[in-house]
Amino acid sequence: PPDQQRLIFAGKQLEDGRTLADYNIQKESTLHLVLRLRGGAKKRKKKTYTKPKKIKHKKKKVKLAVLQFYKVDDTGKVIRLRKECPNAECGAGTFMANHKDRHYCGKCGLTYVYQKGE
């Protein structure tokens, strides 16, 4: 079909409505007839996954969580309720978790286990 054909001379496409003299085409000049390709790449199928997505762990939100770590006594003095981790890499303000038999630092893994007599 003519609408899918293109004439090319010297690397340029010849436009409709112009003559060969406009492009300075002489006798014995070579013209290339090229078919125009329409469309793009083939449509890809959507991936189907065999395993369901892993459900991420949601951290429990506790309102005013700071109240667990400090207490203000009658005189107005602030008392720390949790033990701070003494490890240098944790830094100040890193509290250890209170368990029934031990204190545990979640940052560095340092654990203090209670003696049976305590």
UniProtKB/Swiss-Prot annotation:
| Name of this chain's protein | Ubiquitin-ribosomal protein eS31 fusion protein
Task: Give the taxonomic lineage as stored in the record.
Answer: Eukaryota, Viridiplantae, Streptophyta, Embryophyta, Tracheophyta
Q: Which family does it belong to?
A: In the N-terminal section; belongs to the ubiquitin family. In the C-terminal section; belongs to the eukaryotic ribosomal protein eS31 family.
Keyword Translocase in annotation: no
Q: Which domain of life is it from?
A: Eukaryota
Zinc fingers (C4-type) at which residues? 85-108
Q: What else is known?
A: Ubiquitin is generally synthesized as a polyubiquitin precursor with tandem head to tail repeats. Often, there are one to three additional amino acids after the last repeat, removed in the mature protein. Alternatively, ubiquitin extension protein is synthesized as a single copy of ubiquitin fused to a ribosomal protein (either eL40 or eS31) or to an ubiquitin-related protein (either RUB1 or RUB2). Following translation, extension protein is cleaved from ubiquitin.
The source organism is Asparagus officinalis
Transmembrane region positions?
none
Q: Which PANTHER family match?
A: UBIQUITIN (PTHR10666)
Biological-process GO terms, alphabetical = translation
Q: Which keywords does the record carry?
A: Cytoplasm, Isopeptide bond, Metal-binding, Nucleus, Ribonucleoprotein, Ribosomal protein, Ubl conjugation, Zinc, Zinc-finger
Gene3D superfamilies membership: 6.20.50.150, Phosphatidylinositol 3-kinase Catalytic Subunit, Chain A, domain 1
Could you tell me at which residue positions the Glycyl lysine isopeptide (Gly-Lys) (interchain with K-? in acceptor proteins) crosslink is annotated in this chain? 40
Q: InterPro entries attached here? A: Ribosomal_eS31, Ribosomal_eS31_euk-type_sf, Ribosomal_zn-bd, Ubiquitin-like_dom, Ubiquitin-like_domsf, Ubiquitin_ubiquitin-like
